[in-house]
Amino acid sequence: MLTAKEIRDSFKNFFESKGHHIVPSAPMVIKDDPTLMFTNAGMNQFKDIILGNHPAKYHRVADSQKCLRVSGKHNDLEEVGHDTYHHTMFEMLGNWSFGDYFKKEAINWAWEYLVEVLKLNPEHLYATVFEGSPEEGLSRDDEAASYWEQYLPKDHIINGNKHDNFWEMGDTGPCGPCSEIHIDLRPAEERAKISGRDLVNHDHPQVIEIWNLVFMQYNRKADGSLEPLPAKVIDTGMGFERLCMALQGKTSNYDTDVFQPMLKAIAAMSGTEYGKDKQQDIAMRVIADHIRTIAFSITDGQLPSNAKAGYVIRRILRRAVRYGYTFLGQKQSFMYKLLPVLIDNMGDAYPELIAQKGLIEKVIKEEEEAFLRTLETGIRLLDKTMGDTKAAGKTEISGKDAFTLYDTFGFPLDLTELILRENGMTVNIEEFNAEMQQQKQRARNAAAIETGDWVTLREGTTEFVGYDYTEYEASILRYRQIKQKNQTLYQIVLDCTPFYAESGGQVGDTGVLVSEFETIEVIDTKKENNLPIHITKKLPEHPEAPMMACVDTDKRAACAANHSATHLLDSALREVLGEHIEQKGSLVTPDSLRFDFSHFQKVTDEEIRQVEHLVNAKIRANIPLKEYRNIPIEEAKELGAIALFGEKYGERVRVIQFGSSIEFCGGIHVAATGNIGMVKIISESSVAAGVRRIEAYTGARVEEMLDTIQDTISELKSLFNNAPDLGIAIRKYIEENAGLKKQVEDYMKEKEASLKERLLKNIQEIHGIKVIKFCAPLPAEVVKNIAFQLRGEITENLFFVAGSLDNGKPMLTVMLSDNLVAGGLKAGNLVKEAAKLIQGGGGGQPHFATAGGKNTDGLNAAIEKVLELAGI
């Protein structure tokens, strides 16, 4: 039986023998494509070639690609663990042709590999072909069908509809028919009962798709019409885990050697056995799948967070923790302990797991601990909600309450449902779903972009000349209109550009496009599928005219200084803190720089000072830039250049050197370190577990900051009568202020006690109710303290109502004893209505509520209104 490693290697070896160049997996986290957060298919790293933005270096390519599918079109997350074949992170084996071979070779080689190399039984294989689409004017893919007929009987060739057998990159872009290969893994007796043909694409767990051959031959335009692609593309993808299942004779991906070591480790940790309990098995599969996703995301530079891709990873991690907590009794952090098992299983194929082991473990552990605390908070809130619901005589909590738990506190709906079932209660799912849809719609509206078709003026690709020039004559290749948030913008592609497109943490250049007719402002430059896009607010009236592309040199110079400073900072951090320092992110703007790096504790003030001294010493040394442009990657490594985890490098790279600082980098830099001027670190903080962040200024911004500091010191000296030692004067002031504050607090306590005693002596008893009312210029906190003290002493029939002035703002406070609440009075309802008299509003709990307002003259009337509403 072939192992997973042998299967992966056999695929690469087979296609290498067919003239394919084997490329490494791209990072799972995507950084230069605004339409995607994660690599969700093998073709993602080739999008710029498929879209025609760059020529293909190799016309035949194959690889094994790390993929992640959790959102959008490929949303498999909620199915993961519940069936035998869906995953979040998976490997995609694929082969591509860019303008070389097409359907015939793709089908022939797929058959040869599956049947002749892997020895799969051909009688168990089925192929689907596109049946055509009359409304699109597309006929059946008879060409693909004719090639399959060489290998398969006609009843094993199945027509598929547009949904299953016409692949599209998105709403616009390359597309075409596809042919899926399915395998029937059922035992013979099951195959005798019903044909596999009838189960293809019907979600049968043992009749599954293993390979999809996509024949890209069209381009979908913004108006929905299709046009032929200039160069046809073959894009195939085969699910590695499913292939392992088929070859190893298993009925579940999780029964293969891809997952079994992890499942056994989880079972041992939980004191159970895989295969004994359905719900526990689901939990173990969820964890076994999700630990891979989380670990690989962290190695590729994406940490869990509350935004965008980071939020997706946090969600996946929390889903795994929740299943462990609910079904496996894992009440403490546990997932980080599984990393050695993952490394044993996949470390050879993906050595980045080994290199990043310490960081991955720490991030996962801290995320687990934080979410376990959240779960405890959520359970307490749910307990209160259940109590309030039962007190109202109901057994169903509102969907809005459940959504608040989910959205604000990260408390999952299915866990809410589980706890409710245990207490004989339910949740209004329709209300919950309505709240969820409203939130999704708000997010869609915020992110919605309308993109027009590209208008092509001339063919060609973009040459970047920005390392050598800040002005360059250029012509527009193509442009399109986009609309976002009620703003119309234009994206312009030039044949040559000195504009640096945002990447590697450095923001894009701004500037102008100048022709003999007009000047167009470039407000940003982005990179989309490796293509520099110039963003403008208006389109040139004469787009075919040649123009000078002129970069804003002041902003460019400031960016260059900050970018070079990050390199010096990285080098200095390694020298001061240790060689474990690895860059985890950066942001370089004209105003400042931000640098994220792996480190497991706070950087001390003394260490920051040492780092600053080292960086500024190199700046004063005026070290010249040494640039190695377009050199082989192996040569770069021999130079000692530092590569970033999660970045994909080509075979030829650019290296930037300032003395001992040597890094792979495609950004803009100063000619010599002296141009930076000076570096001043302005903050150091934690970003995530094991990741610290430094923010700093350079050059003129340091000067501005020093001016501000000097102005502040001068002002303080003036305030302290030009004391010779400002530090001593401030400390003395703080000590004196603390003493005075203590005196005020003591006075307020005495006043509070005195007022309470007076109120007790002046209780009015009306219809058996002990009414305490007053109006005084007191802080809200003092009134609250008095109210709770009185409630502790008068346990029945207490009706407390007070008007107060807190910093000139009128406040109304009501406190009721429990028996009055039980009798139907609600403090919140009383203050809500009475607050109108002080032009305000408020609320609170049934026994205690407050309201604030604007009209101080209405306080006494508001007090009387409370009594009137209560019927007193």
UniProtKB/Swiss-Prot annotation:
First-tier enzyme category under EC: ligase
Cofactors required: Zn(2+)
Keyword set, alphabetical order: Aminoacyl-tRNA synthetase, ATP-binding, Cytoplasm, Ligase, Metal-binding, Nucleotide-binding, Protein biosynthesis, RNA-binding, tRNA-binding, Zinc
Localization in the cell: Cytoplasm
EC number: 6.1.1.7
GO cellular component, one term: cytoplasm
Top-level taxonomic group: Bacteria
Reactions mediated catalytically: tRNA(Ala) + L-alanine + ATP = L-alanyl-tRNA(Ala) + AMP + diphosphate
Amino acids binding Zn(2+): H563, H567, C665, H669
Keyword Metal-binding: yes
Classification via InterPro entries: aa-tRNA-synth_II/BPL/LPL (IPR045864), Ala-tRNA-lgiase_IIc (IPR002318), Ala-tRNA-ligase_IIc_anticod-bd (IPR018162), Ala-tRNA-synth_IIc_core (IPR018165), Ala-tRNA-synth_IIc_N (IPR018164), Ala-tRNA_ligase (IPR050058), Ala_tRNA_ligase_euk/bac (IPR023033), DHHA1_dom (IPR003156)
One Gene Ontology term from the biological process aspect of the record: alanyl-tRNA aminoacylation
Comment on bound cofactor: Binds 1 zinc ion per subunit.
GO molecular function (one): aminoacyl-tRNA deacylase activity
Pfam assignment, any one: tRNA-synt_2c
SUPFAM superfamilies, alphabetized: Class II aaRS and biotin synthetases, Putative anticodon-binding domain of alanyl-tRNA synthetase (AlaRS), ThrRS/AlaRS common domain, Translation proteins
Family: Belongs to the class-II aminoacyl-tRNA synthetase family.
Family matches, as PANTHER family: ALANINE--TRNA LIGASE, CYTOPLASMIC, ALANYL-TRNA SYNTHETASE
Domains as described in the record: Consists of three domains; the N-terminal catalytic domain, the editing domain and the C-terminal C-Ala domain. The editing domain removes incorrectly charged amino acids, while the C-Ala domain, along with tRNA(Ala), serves as a bridge to cooperatively bring together the editing and aminoacylation centers thus stimulating deacylation of misacylated tRNAs.
Function: Catalyzes the attachment of alanine to tRNA(Ala) in a two-step reaction: alanine is first activated by ATP to form Ala-AMP and then transferred to the acceptor end of tRNA(Ala). Also edits incorrectly charged Ser-tRNA(Ala) and Gly-tRNA(Ala) via its editing domain.
Name this protein carries in UniProt: Alanine--tRNA ligase
Species name: Bacteroides thetaiotaomicron (strain ATCC 29148 / DSM 2079 / JCM 5827 / CCUG 10774 / NCTC 10582 / VPI-5482 / E50)
